[in-house]
Amino acid sequence: MAQNQPSSAIAVIPSDTINIPVPGIITSGTNTSGVATTLTDAGQDFRNSATNPNGYNISGGDVVISAAGVICEIASVDSATQLTLLAPGIAAGAYDIYKGNYQIQGESEGFTLFVGTGGPATVLRIQTLEGQDVSLLNVPDSSFIPIQVQRGWAATTTCSNILALQ
């Protein structure tokens, strides 16, 4: 179960396919590729031989979030300066990479959500740690959600300014 006093947080970008990533940027940079599903950054070395001494590795399943707020998953590390991304990919520009949250159901602590903007007729659709699809209705502004979550769905979610606390 999540702690009552979280020590980390990440802004939730609702996605129907990607779990909320692990809080904490592992690296960031500027994508110069003109192809949405290719991330190219001459200032990076994505290979494990370079990243492992820094305390992390980048691999398929990790998550890229663009400065525009688009979330996508890394499919593979192709070279020192290039990653292949799963659709939708991202446009050229600034990005952050986070560790993916590929959870085994029931074996992770998950997230407590804080909903900044809700209100009457709002919907927050979530996936619980056990994989259940739950829609919460009429979620008030500035609300904590009392269920452990691994994903915030894009489909039908109308709440915004959501934080995942861990």
Region locations from a protein language model:
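Surface-exposed, low-hydrophobicity beta-strand/loop segments enriched in small/polar/acidic residues
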Residues: 1-24, 57-59, 63-76, 92, ...
